[in-house]
């Protein structure tokens, strides 16, 4: 999980992968029951997000018109990075599903206008990735945006 937290030393730590112990502490109030395949997918998505972080930041900066990338809400940047990584890395997930899921997460966990901002950026990013041939989807119906 990516989060911005302030740990015992009082220093904010951004974009840190949490340890299993830290996750367990966060889940103390709300238990999350993960299936094996969900854990596997989550780890793969985190790895892909980290692997493509530089490229994702370049795309976000390019299409977040009139926004300083450092002023974009941290959660919005993380969601955008995750969506870009998922588009590039997971051939079995339709682009429409990736974008819709990220928008739902933004509506639920970020600011009131985050989903509109993310949708605008992702439309442009998706178009560029598609033109560049960076999105390789396999399976029936997966090439539709």
Residue ranges and their predicted role:
Residues 1-145:
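N-terminal interaction/assembly modules
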């Amino acid at each position: 999980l990516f989060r911005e937290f302030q740990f015992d030393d009082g220093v904010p730590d951004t974009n840190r992968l949490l340890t299993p112990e830290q996750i367990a502490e966060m889940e103390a109030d709300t238990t999350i029951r993960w299936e094996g395949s969900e854990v596997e997918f989550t780890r793969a998505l985190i790895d892909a997000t980290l692997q493509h972080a530089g490229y994702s930041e370049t795309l976000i900066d390019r299409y977040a018109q009139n926004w300083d990338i450092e002023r974009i809400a941290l959660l919005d940047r993380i969601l955008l990075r995750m969506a870009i990584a998922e588009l590039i890395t997971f051939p079995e997930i339709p682009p429409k599903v990736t974008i819709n899921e990220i928008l739902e997460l933004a509506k639920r966990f970020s600011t009131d206008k985050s989903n509109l901002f993310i949708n605008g950026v992702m439309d442009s990013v998706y178009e560029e990735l598609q033109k560049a041939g960076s999105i390789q989807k396999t399976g029936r119906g997966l090439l539709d945006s």
